[in-house]
Design a protein with these regions (language model features):
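Bacterial N-terminal signal peptides that target proteins for export
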Residues: 1-7
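Bacterial N-terminal signal peptides
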Residues: 7-15
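A beta-rich soluble binding module of mature secreted/lumenal proteins
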Residues: 18-183
Length: 183
């Protein structure tokens, strides 16, 4: 339990820290997000992962983020992946989220451990709700997600280019292998 608390505290500090560049803080998209449509499974196909001495999502396989809107308006989040291979140990995080900007529903807060919160920004979302990019204000981390686990190389490269346009160093993005027989 101590390690989990330490992970949450340090992750929060990293996610809300000062940016090390001259870019303004990352902003979420301006158009409204339909929360019901956004809920469900998102396959994490690429990321600039959290990778520290105390916790790491580097070398994740079969990463999936699931969102469920609860009756009280919170967003129950489950992030699951296999560490170091498709047969690796399953890792799971279960933060609680909520909408911070109710005008657009594109800026959330995530809480892994009370009272610590971190900003969670929907920085890109296609019109069909098939691909999204989630970022943090200081551009330390990013997650590229798709409704399908297997996206073509052209789609993946287009999304990595969007990450670059958002001000991230796209050379840090790691592709997350996905291999599913059925889901």
């Amino acid at each position: 339990m101590y390690a989990a608390r330490l992970f949450v505290i340090l992750t929060f500090m990293l996610m809300t820290g000062c940016a090390m560049n001259d870019l303004p803080r990352l902003q979420s998209i301006e158009r409204p997000v339909d929360l019901q449509r956004f809920m469900g499974d998102w396959y994490v196909v690429g990321s600039i992962p959290i990778d520290t001495w105390f916790a790491s999502e580097a070398n994740a396989h079969n990463a999936v983020e699931n969102y469920v809107l609860t009756d009280d308006g919170k967003i129950q989040t489950t992030y699951t992946f296999r560490k170091d291979g498709f047969d690796g140990e399953e890792q799971q995080f279960n933060p609680i989220g909520w909408v911070h900007n109710t005008n657009t529903n594109s800026e959330w807060r995530m809480q892994f451990l009370w009272p610590f919160r971190s900003a969670y920004l929907i920085a890109y979302l296609d019109e069909d709700y098939q691909h999204t990019i989630i970022g943090v204000p200081n551009r330390t981390y990013v997650w590229i997600m798709s409704r399908e686990p297997d996206i073509g190389e052209d789609v993946y490269e287009r999304l990595v280019n969007v990450v670059s346009e958002l001000g991230y160093d796209s050379s840090l993005v790691q592709r997350i292998p996905q291999q599913w027989s059925e889901r």
